[in-house]
Regions:
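ABC nucleotide-binding domain "signature" region
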Residues: 20-32
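Helix N-cap at the start of a conserved alpha-helix in ABC-type nucleotide-binding domains
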Residues: 77-79
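Conserved ABC ATPase signature
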Residues: 41-45, 49
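Catalytic Walker B motif of ABC-type/P-loop ATPase nucleotide-binding domains
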Residues: 66-69
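Short coil-to-helix segment of the ABC ATPase nucleotide-binding domain corresponding to the Q-loop/switch region
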Residues: 1-8
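Hydrophobic anchor residue at the start of the ABC signature
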Residues: 55, 83
């Protein structure tokens, strides 16, 4: 279920008590507008909903840094923008640092700083 999928990182975080899991999962799901999907199977969700589940997994432990590897890959333009809006809002509202790996220039353009790499080497920096 979506609930169990979001719970995965909590099971590995020994600092968060099991009694807090349900509340944290519901809070993360609510912030991403997927609270009504918690009892569904992930396979039944749309691509955009699956991306929001992945983001919920990333934020449920409330860490200061979110690492997102191609968070909008395979999404259409509308869902790409929705996912980016959600990620940017989380950073702005909660003071999180977001590190994004992307090949999509429209995603990169929304970032404060950009580091371009080729063959494992930094080739360009912007916004510093």
């Amino acid at each position: 279920s979506v609930f169990n999928n979001i719970r995965i990182p909590l099971l590995y975080n020994k600092k968060i008590k099991r009694g807090e899991h349900k509340e944290r999962i519901h809070r993360a799901a609510e912030s991403l507008l997927i609270q009504d999907k918690l009892h569904r199977k992930v396979e039944q969700l749309s691509g955009g909903e699956r991306q929001r589940v992945a983001i919920a997994r990333a934020i449920v432990c409330d860490q200061p840094i979110i690492l997102a590897d191609e968070p909008t890959g395979s999404l259409d333009a509308v869902n790409r923008d929705r996912v980016m809006d959600i990620l940017m809002d989380l950073c702005n509202e909660k003071g999180k640092t977001l590190i994004i790996v992307t090949h999509d220039t429209s995603v990169a353009e929304r970032c404060d700083r950009i580091i371009r790499m080729k063959d494992g080497q930094i080739t360009d920096r912007a916004g510093e």
